[in-house]
Design a protein with these regions (language model features):
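Primarily recognizes the serine-hydrolase "nucleophile elbow" in alpha/beta-hydrolase
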Residues: 133-203, 221
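Short beta-strand element of the alpha/beta-hydrolase
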Residues: 72-81
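C-terminal catalytic histidine-bearing segment of alpha/beta-hydrolase fold enzymes
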Residues: 253-305
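Short beta-strand/loop motif that positions the catalytic acidic residue
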Residues: 238-241
Length: 305
């Protein structure tokens, strides 16, 4: 835990500070679907400058609020990537939240549980429970945080994109206690080089193995191949992907096609090159996808009450 604190302070002081706090996702750390086990969470800042957090079993939500005079009322929950093995918590988490807050969008970094048979009764739903809890938490605290509860979206990178798209296609069934019947449907999704499908030849085998296990049934693979779960209630979506990504751009193509087929609004930024894991800025392009997403949000989510 000492290493985590040091790295957290490093990140905190390295960036301009908006109103922010890290809070337990579940009250009193009463985490559902959990097995009592030692807290082995570990954070490490690699030589490549990437902050990686592993073995997360106690999820948190970090809150980044814009100044009231800049607030748009929009909110986004950010799910870092990492193959359901680690969380790339800096360039796909805190850095992104800071940038959204600068642009007037309240941002929330979700440090979600990483699937483990050692800490979860059913590891396949653990991350989804955390995403649903984050949506519930933001909506139920919308007044305090100066947020319109009808402008709460979710953003995910890579495997975090799989989690975000799972939240956007599996919201009909609550995996958490929801006594107030708060809507668990995100109002929009932003999916950046996402894993969408677990079909062979499209999906990311590492993410599938970490979430579903070594030999998942076809039923389970289909359930979490989110292009197969789209319906008329699926939220509007923005997709960002590079054509040379090792997580095949076919993930985004197939999701885009199904969304269009179902009449769901979808917009895209597809780069000719850029690879995987570039975060907010693709150094091989002059296009800033954050600018594109900001314009998309203003166009489609500004006039809500």
């Amino acid at each position: 835990m000492k290493n985590i604190l040091i790295l957290t302070l490093m990140v905190f002081f390295a960036i301009p500070s908006f109103s922010q706090k890290e809070m337990p996702l579940y009250n009193n750390y009463h985490v559902p679907n959990s097995i009592s086990a030692p807290d082995e969470e570990h954070a490490e800042l690699g030589e490549d400058g990437i902050l990686r957090i592993s073995k997360v079993s106690f999820p948190t939500l970090s809150v980044y609020l814009p100044p009231k005079e800049k607030a748009t009322g929009q909110a986004v929950i950010i799910c870092p990537g990492g193959g359901y093995w680690i969380l790339a918590a800096g360039h796909e988490g805190a850095d992104v939240a800071e940038e959204f807050a600068k642009r007037g969008v309240a941002a929330f970094v979700l440090k979600y549980r990483l699937p483990s048979d050692e800490t979860m009764i059913d590891k396949t739903i653990g991350p989804l429970q955390d995403a649903q809890k984050a949506i519930q938490t933001v909506r139920e605290n919308a007044k305090e945080w100066n947020i319109n509860p009808e402008k709460v979206g979710i953003l995910g990178f890579s495997a975090g994109g799989h989690l975000a798209s799972t939240a956007g296609t599996h919201f009909h069934q609550a995996q958490i206690d929801n006594p107030k019947k708060t809507s668990l449907r995100p109002d929009f999704m932003v999916l950046v080089y996402p894993v969408i499908s677990f079909d062979p030849g499209i999906g990311h085998s590492g993410s599938s193995k970490n979430l579903l296990g070594e030999n998942p049934s076809q039923e389970l693979l289909d359930k979490f191949s989110n292009e197969k779960q789209v319906n008329a209630a699926t939220p509007p979506t923005y997709l960002v992907h590079a054509k040379d990504d090792r997580v095949s751009i076919r993930n985004s193509y197939v999701f885009e096609a199904v969304l269009q087929e179902k009449g769901i609004h979808v917009s895209t930024t597809y780069f000719e090159s850029g690879g995987h894991g570039f975060g907010m800025v693709n150094p091989q392009s002059e296009i800033i996808w954050m600018d594109e997403v900001e314009a998309w949000l203003k166009k489609h989510f500004t006039n809500l009450p």
